[in-house]
Design a protein with these regions (language model features):
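Active-site-proximal, substrate-binding regions of enzyme catalytic domains
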Residues: 1-89, 95-142
Length: 143
């Protein structure tokens, strides 16, 4: 089965190109990676450059598609269209994109770590540290 890979997978798990076969990368995904290499975040720009190097090492193993260039749809919509037309599987860790794929009856899956980012970090304070924070002007999270 053909596998259409989203930008976030190439950023976070470029080794997918070593581990999976029949990979399709849209030119729009390459454009996103190219733009991200200049991102002010060192981590993001590093990941974009690392993805580019990994892709360059696998050029003969990857199918690149540029057939949706004239469409004014989002990159996500183009990924869905490609997965649908190619009867492929969309590989993304974008939750909303996986939901859209499910709605359209397109097979999709995540890749890599099953731990998703919650946006929350739990910090345990010692009793004396906790006393310091009680005088600050913010409300403690009760959840």
């Amino acid at each position: 089965m053909l596998k259409i890979v989203d930008t976030n997978i190439l950023l976070d798990f470029p080794q997918i190109l070593d581990e999976e076969k029949d990979i399709i990368i849209l030119v729009e995904v390459l454009r996103e990676l190219d733009g991200l290499k200049l991102n002010p975040s060192f981590e993001t720009s590093f990941k974009a450059r690392r993805a580019a190097v990994t892709i360059s090492h696998h050029l003969s193993d990857i199918t690149f598609k540029d057939c949706y260039e004239n469409l004014t749809k989002s990159v996500d919509d183009k990924l869905l269209l490609c997965a649908d037309e190619c009867f492929g599987e969309l590989i993304t860790n974008d939750v909303y994109l996986k939901v859209k794929a499910h709605i359209k009856g397109i097979k999709s899956r995540g890749y890599g770590s099953s731990e998703s980012y919650s946006g929350v970090r739990t910090v345990f304070l010692q009793t004396d540290e906790n006393r310091y924070h009680k005088d600050l002007d913010f409300m403690m999270n009760n959840h």
